[in-house]
Amino acid sequence: MLHKLLIVVFLVVCLHDMRLNGQKKKETLLSEKVSQMMEWVSKRAVVRLNGEKFKRLVRAHPRNYSVIVMFTALQPQRQCGVCRQADEEYQILANSWRYSSAFTNRIFFAMVDFDEGSDVFQMLNMNSAPTFINFPAKGKPKRADTYELQVRGFAAEQLARWVADRTDVHIRVIRPPNYAGPLMLGLLLAFIGSLAYLRRNNLEFLFNKNVWAFSALCFVLIMTSGQMWNHIRGPPYAHKNPNTGQVSYIHGSSQAQFVAETHIVLLFNAAVTIGMVLLHEAATSGLDIVKRKIMCVAGIGLVVLFFSWLLSVFRAKYHGYPYSFLFG
């Protein structure tokens, strides 16, 4: 009986020691991973990962830190202009966190380039870039851990809000100073001042209703085309399918848009406006009948053609919209 009791005690002690050794080994491994990440971050805010580093530092356990990973294709032969723009915003976000007083090892920013880690793209069944995914400290990434690039855009401020939602880490985005805006404003004011000085004896153009009407019309066209949304969200200019190479200029969702789409809508609205002006002039001007007929036909053509295209764009974004004109 005593012999059996000693065997049981011996087994319990051995299992306890094995558990302690396993725990110590786990803690040592975790400490090494965190130290490695901190060392890399001290040199560069965004850690570049290949397949082996991604598996060891992001996928493998133990891990008590979250990793935001941007999957991209920055090599020139990939011809991904959006990737370069997204990378600039991502670098701004990562540097804002790196040099923040609240910086900790709770979260790291990393990047996997297709040409350096194509096996990672295959592992995750990923066929588009850029893509942002949050790998949480515990558990696997959920659907909300994949950033909705087409909806939110890739502005650093939008990425920071998403990071705060997924990790509860709030980052104040600090952009490097950009002197282009103040410089352009200064040049514009100098131009206006010079023009006013040169024509100081004849300032009737400031009271010309056509000048103010044209200026107001340009402002309305710019605002109704979605330029302010672009300024806030920072969407890509267009989207190129990496598999087919086809470029999309119109976003298929009513919740987002491309910059090119804004230019297209602005052009269509401007053409419809010109058509309406021609129709008005054809009916009220004192020109001869032939010129008025030409203006009338041109105005009708512009309104019908471009309003039809405008409706087709609307139908492409709002699926199920029942109305169309010339184009289905």
UniProtKB/Swiss-Prot annotation:
Known pathway: Protein modification; protein glycosylation
Phenotype on disruption: Early developmental arrest.
Xref: InterPro entries: OligosaccharylTrfase_OST3/OST6, Thioredoxin-like_sf
Major localization listed first in the record, in broad terms: membrane
First and last residue of the signal peptide: 1-22
Transmembrane segments: 178-198, 203-223, 258-278, 294-314
Disulfide linkage: 80-83
Key words, A-Z: Cell membrane, Disulfide bond, Endoplasmic reticulum, Glycoprotein, Magnesium, Membrane, Signal, Transmembrane, Transmembrane helix, Transport
GO CC annotation terms, alphabetical: oligosaccharyltransferase complex; plasma membrane
Cellular compartment(s): Cell membrane; Endoplasmic reticulum; Endoplasmic reticulum membrane
Membrane topology: Multi-pass membrane protein
Glycosylated sites: 64
Ranges per topology, Cytoplasmic: 199-202, 279-293
GO biological process, one term: protein N-linked glycosylation via asparagine
Extracellular side: 23-177, 224-257, 315-328
Domain Thioredoxin: 40-168
Record's function text: Accessory component of the STT3B-containing form of the N-oligosaccharyl transferase (OST) complex which catalyzes the transfer of a high mannose oligosaccharide from a lipid-linked oligosaccharide donor to an asparagine residue within an Asn-X-Ser/Thr consensus motif in nascent polypeptide chains. Involved in N-glycosylation of STT3B-dependent substrates. Specifically required for the glycosylation of a subset of acceptor sites that are near cysteine residues; in this function seems to act redundantly with TUSC3.
Family from the record: Belongs to the OST3/OST6 family.
Subunit relationships: Accessory component of the STT3B-containing form of the oligosaccharyltransferase (OST) complex.
Stated name of the protein: Dolichyl-diphosphooligosaccharide--protein glycosyltransferase subunit MAGT1
Gene: magt1
